[in-house]
Amino acid sequence: MCSPASSKILYRNPRFLRVAFLQLHHQQQSGVFCDALLQAEGEAVPAHCCILSACSPFFTERLERERPVQGRKVVLEMGGLKIQTLRKLVDFLYTSEMEVSQEEAQDVLSAARQLRVSELETLQLEGGKLVKAPQGRRLNRECLQPPAAAPISARVVGPKSRPQTPLPVTQTPSPLGAVRLKSLGEEEGAHKKTNLPNADSLSDTQLKKKARVCLTQESRSSPSSQREGPKETKSNPGPTALPSLYPSVDEQLLPRKIRLSRSKPSPHVYTSTPSSILSGPSSMPTAPGRRLWRQRTVSKEAQGVDKQKPGEVRPLQSTPDPSDVGKPAENKKQSPELRAPTSSSVEEGQVGRVKLRKIVNGTCWEVVQEPPLRNTQDSPQILEPSDVEEPSGTLLSSVNEQEIPARIQLCQDSPESPRLQDILLSASHSPDHPMVKSEFGSSPMLTGKESDLNIDCREPYTFDTTLLGQPCEAEQYRITSAAATSELEEIFDFMLCGSDVEPPVGSLESPGAEGCRTPSYHLSETGKNWIEGEEWCLPDMELWPRDLTGLEKEPVSENKEPVEPFSPLVMRSENTESFEPLSPLVMPSEVSREELSLRGSWTPDLEITSSQPLDGQGEKLLHFDSSDPSQRSYNHLSPPCSDWAETGLEVSLGMDDVLCPVPKAVREVSANPEQLDPLPGSSEDEEIDVVDWTVEKKLGPTSVPSVWPDPSSESETEVDILT
């Protein structure tokens, strides 16, 4: 405006826009030229698409997608908005003015943010007034709003990643069968050897037993090592690495219980022989507590019990840690007994709580038997004849006494019990178990604790070895004599090497049924006598480990009469040239000695020799001549289980691979486990009437259901086992 000629005139009239918009507002109010309808709550608000799109990017996007057809109006559904709020907003678009109550203000502001009305979405209600939020806040809000979407995505991602982490956890648990054992094995690294057979033979019932024995076994806590041992038998390469990962999961599961049961046995027996166990399945012995039991279960599986894998059972047989297997089983069986009656407290005649009873018949028996099978695999360790001869008779007798009651109870509990009992008896009779324990670093302690510790550490393996080593052809074990021989040889090799693993017999019989002593039966030649004065004690712990311990503690003199086949449980060790089938619980002493020599704790008294071959003696009865209470106990035990077959003494053998199939007699016994009297609270207090095995001599071949000890061979005193 400097010069009229050159200057340009600039004129501004803010009212015009206002007037124009007011005119548009009138048109909107009257619905003239309106090409859009905004619907909410069933009502519609007319509007101009150009105005809507100019004031809100939200409407711009919507109208671009839904362009109005010529002559028709676009209908936009405004879900979630109140009609009054919508009207207020549209009025503001046309007039830039709005009058609302405080209650409506929040709705209008939220709707403005939803519809992205720029001049309203930045407002906020403060002190009854609508004021523009500071730009800082606005920026923050803007940042927060986009992040709002991000959080959603983040949430999605977060859950995804979380599931991924759990998935690995789930995946890791997926191999729980192996993983549990592994993890347990690592935990029980110290006790691998002790519990190795147990873990393999553990069945569900066995696991329950472990839970029972859990307290005592916890003290023995070396389940990780034991489990590792069985793991190695199953899968040596993987289990070693996995144990660390799985221990928590497995331990949380039954395996923890297994640890408890294993821990007691491992400290004593496996310290000495860790090398052999570790070299083979020892790394898994921690898990072995379970595995050992599973392996025994596998034997039962062979008999019809599927709780344990046959592979596991064989690992027990071949695993150099049969003692481990036996121990965990024993620990489980013993720990209850250890809690209540220790080996010292529980004397020959005493019978402690038998948790084996609680265990499912099939399951319990499976656990006991499977460790023997594993021992067969570990035969090299188990089959040390010198060690077998070395075991102290006293320990064997006491252990035998303790174990025999447990075996009887097993017979009562499950159809397979007869076989188990036979195996237990034979294992208990062999003096090897005590010897084996002494050989182990902890063996001396075990010898001292013969009833308590021997069961855990030495006897389980010793018994396992005997069982593995002495398959009865008459009993027809799955394992051929050649296979059994090879396994037995391996066991002997391991034993010579000083491995902790003992034959399944040890695992079957508790290393030291603490507080329980089972009469040990002498399966040795007629010249040998059972140790008298020892009474059957039913251990609270699982049958196999306890039984082994009882036999171990209880010195048994060799039978004067040749051992005769009683039940399929009797096994013939390769070491023994000929062995007669023993009663389900009895195993040839010679085999025990040779196989169980590794267990220094075995007493020579328990030595069982058979003048006649097992196969040929299927019909003959065992004769026990002994002044030992174990012999007495056994005689007394027989009457309650007068018909081992009837009583269901047959015990499914976890050592099917190692041993020939159990004779029909044993199986019959197992079929009638109920007939057997429950384990007596105290063997001493109660007497077990044992029919003369000689009288019932040749009750029948191994197939004959009932087997009776020979009263002439056994001690004069008879003990009646009361439930």
UniProtKB/Swiss-Prot annotation:
Localization in the cell: Nucleus
Basic and acidic residues composition bias: residue spans: 303-312, 327-336, 617-626
Gene assigned in the entry: Btbd18
Keywords, ordered alphabetically: Differentiation, Nucleus, Phosphoprotein, Spermatogenesis, Transcription, Transcription regulation
Gene3D superfamilies in UniProt: Potassium Channel Kv1.1, Chain A (3.30.710.10)
Protein name from the UniProt record: BTB/POZ domain-containing protein 18
Any matching Pfam family: BTB
Tissue expression pattern: Expressed in testis.
